[in-house]
Amino acid sequence: MDVEEIKRKKLLELQKKLAEQQQQEEALLEAEMQKRALLRKILTPEARERLERIRLARPEFAEAVEVQLIQLAQLGRLPIPLSDEDFKALLERISALTKRKREIKIVRK
């Protein structure tokens, strides 16, 4: 193997990795766009605004709520479109289920 052949193989490997990475990014973008489209159908504009405000404060919680909303809608267990009031009630139920109990203990010496 000469130096040129090694360089060519290395270049091909890098190009292949780059192409795979671009495909993954495109797939993620496509999935995100589909999720947004579903949420647009599921939620009223006011409820979507509320979800976006939640995303700013707690991104992980917003992601979990989105997944649950989509699953419930696909199972037919949500009124479509979901009003802001119904969305608030759903958020309260989800929050109550996922809320961690925080206990503070003070040890005095």
Curated annotation (Swiss-Prot):
Entry keyword annotation includes Isomerase: no
Source organism per UniProt: Methanocaldococcus jannaschii (strain ATCC 43067 / DSM 2661 / JAL-1 / JCM 10045 / NBRC 100440) (Methanococcus jannaschii)
Descriptive protein name: DNA-binding protein MJ0691
Keywords recorded for this protein, A-Z: DNA-binding
Record-linked Gene3D superfamilies: PDCD5-like (1.10.8.140)
Family in the record: Belongs to the PDCD5 family.
Gene Ontology CC terms, in alphabetical order: cytosol
GO molecular function term, any single one: DNA binding
Coiled-coil intervals: none
Record InterPro entries: DNA_bind_arc, PDCD5-like, PDCD5-like_sf
